[in-house]
A protein has these predicted regions:
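Secretory targeting and sorting signals
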Residues: 1-33
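Signature of short aromatic-glycine-proline-rich micro-motifs recurring in repeat-based ectodomains
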Residues: 58-63, 100-101, 120-122, 163-194, ...
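Residue-level signature of beta-propeller blades and closely related beta-rich strand-turn architectures
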Residues: 79, 118-120, 133, 153, ...
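Surface-exposed loop and turn segments in beta-propeller and other repeat-based domains
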Residues: 46-53, 135-187, 229-264, 308-341
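Blade-loop segments of beta-propeller domains
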Residues: 87-125
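Beta-strand-rich domains and repeat architectures in extracellular enzymes and scaffolds
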Residues: 49-79, 100-103, 195
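Residue-level detector of Asp-centered blade-edge/turn motifs that repeat once per structural unit
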Residues: 66-70, 106-110, 194-200, 273-276, ...
C-alpha cells in the first residue's frame, strides 16, 4: 500500500482545491465538505458524460468502478467482469464466474478492483480482487488465469447460516424463514472509505444483502462490515469453484448497523463520497408498510457510530449504530431519511460533487437478449426526491 505520509500530504494539498471547486458547483447544505482519507483525483481529470459498458450474454449489471489515473472503467455483470476505456471501448473481460459478482470499488492504494462474490449454495462468501493491469484481452478465465484472487468472509457465513429458530435445520437460500441473522442473504455493496467508528484509516466496507421479509422485525437494519485490507495478501487465494477455500480474517474490524427498514436484498451499491464525507447506500425498495422504502439512504459521515440498540432482535442486542443524514425525504413515524434515485446498478463518486450513476438494460441481438450497462455522469444537488441531476463533462 502506498505510504500513509504520501497519502496524507496529497490530501492536504488538494483539499483546498476540491473545496473551492465544490463550492462553485453549489448544492445542498447537507453536502458538508470534510477531508477525504482517500487520494484526491487529479484536477486534470475530465470525465466523459457517459461510459458505455457494452452488451453481453450475462447477468444484469451489478456495479461499476473507475480507475481515474489509467482511464479505465469496470462493469460487473453478475457472472462477467468487463474492463473498458473511458470511451467505452472494451479492453478485456473476465469470465468463468458461476457465483454472483456484485458491487465493485477501485482501491487506489494497490491499484486493484474489489468486488463482492457469493456462492450461496455452498455457503461461501468472498471479496473478489481483480488485478486490472493483467486484464488485457477478452474472455480471460477467472479460474485459469492470474487476474483474480479471493478472500473468504467468515462473519458473513456465520450470520447467513444462523439457525435463528433453533430447530436444527438451516433453511437455505430463501427469505421465507426465520433463519439468517439480521435477515442476511449474503453480501453485495462494497466501498473504500474511513473507519465508521471515527478513528480514521482507510477500510474496505462490505454491506450485507438482506432478504425481503415483512413478517419479521429483526431485518430492518443495513449491516456494514469494515476490514483493514493492508495485510490481506496473506489470505488471498486463487478461485477454485470445485474446492472453495476458507482463507480470510476470523472477524471484521468493525460491524455497524443503519436503521432504514427492511429492503429487498440490502445494499446493492455502497459508495463513500470524499467530498461530503458521507456514505451512500442504493437499494432495491423494501415492502414493509411501516417504513418509507426509499431507494437511497445516506449515512452521516460526520457522526461516528455510537453504541445503541439493534432494534427488533429476538433478544436485546446492542451494536455500533450509524446515523442517517437528516436531509432529503423524511418519514416521521419511523424517523428514517432518504431519497428516491438510481444507483442500484452502479454508483461511483468522483469526490467533487459528481457521480457516475449506472443504468442497466437489455437489447435484442438476433433473438438473444443481451444485458447492457452505462455509467452516466451526474452532479449532487441534494434536491428531493432525486438528489442527482444529469451533468455533461464540461461543467
Amino acid at each position: 500500500m502506498r505510504s500513509r505520509a504520501r497519502t496524507h500530504v496529497a490530501t492536504l494539498l488538494l483539499s483546498a482545491v476540491l473545496a473551492s471547486a465544490a463550492l462553485a458547483v453549489g448544492g445542498d447544505p447537507a453536502h458538508a465538505r470534510t477531508p477525504s482519507p482517500s487520494p484526491s483525483p487529479s484536477s486534470a481529470f475530465r470525465p466523459p458524460a457517459s461510459v458505455d459498458g457494452g452488451a453481453w450474454s450475462s447477468g444484469h449489471l451489478q456495479g461499476t468502478a473507475i480507475d481515474r489515473r489509467r482511464g479505465h472503467m469496470y462493469f460487473s455483470f453478475t457472472n462477467l467482469l468487463v474492463k473498458t476505456d473511458l470511451a467505452g471501448r472494451p479492453i478485456g473481460s473476465v469470465t468463468g464466474l458461476t457465483g454472483h459478482l456484485g458491487d465493485l470499488d477501485f482501491n487506489s492504494a494497490d491499484g486493484r478492483v474489489y468486488g463482492s462474490l457469493e456462492y450461496k449454495a455452498a455457503q461461501a462468501f468472498y471479496v473478489a480482487i481483480f488485478d486490472g493491469s493483467r486484464i488485457t484481452r477478452m474472455n480471460m478465465d477467472a479460474r485459469t488465469t492470474d487476474v483474480l484472487s479471493t478472500v473468504h468472509l467468515r462473519e458473513v457465513v456465520r450470520d447467513y447460516t444462523a439457525d435463528m429458530n433453533g430447530d436444527g435445520v438451516f433453511d437455505g437460500d430463501t427469505g421465507n424463514t426465520p433463519d439468517h441473522r439480521y435477515g442476511c442473504s449474503g453480501i453485495d455493496g462494497v466501498a473504500f472509505g474511513p473507519g465508521l467508528n471515527g478513528r480514521g484509516g482507510v477500510r474496505l466496507t462490505v454491506a450485507y444483502g438482506v432478504y425481503s421479509n415483512t413478517t419479521r422485525t429483526d431485518n430492518d437494519h443495513q449491516v456494514l462490515l469494515q476490514y483493514d485490507v493492508r495485510d490481506w495478501r496473506k489470505y488471498e487465494r486463487p478461485l477454485s469453484e470445485d474446492a472453495l477455500h476458507t482463507s480470510g480474517p476470523a472477524s471484521p474490524d468493525g460491524k455497524f448497523f443503519a436503521y432504514t427498514g427492511n429492503t429487498t436484498y440490502g445494499v446493492q451499491n455502497l459508495e463513500y463520497d470524499g467530498d461530503s464525507g458521507n456514505w451512500l447506500m442504493a437499494v432495491y425498495k423494501g415492502k414493509k408498510a411501516a417504513f418509507p422504502n426509499y431507494g437511497l439512504y445516506v449515512v452521516d459521515g460526520s457522526k461516528p457510530a455510537r453504541r445503541g440498540e439493534v432494534k427488533g432482535q429476538p433478544r436485546p442486542e446492542s451494536g455500533r449504530i450509524l446515523s442517517l443524514l437528516p436531509r432529503g425525504l423524511h418519514h416521521e413515524p419511523s424517523g428514517v431519511y432518504g431519497y428516491e434515485s438510481g444507483g442500484q446498478y452502479g454508483l461511483v463518486s468522483l469526490d467533487d460533487g459528481r457521480y457516475y450513476v449506472a443504468e442497466a438494460g437489455t437489447v435484442d441481438s438476433g433473438g438473444t437478449t443481451l444485458q447492457t450497462g452505462r455509467a452516466v455522469l451526474h452532479r449532487w444537488t441534494g434536491a428531493v426526491p432525486n438528489p442527482f441531476a444529469v451533468r455533461g463533462p464540461a461543467g
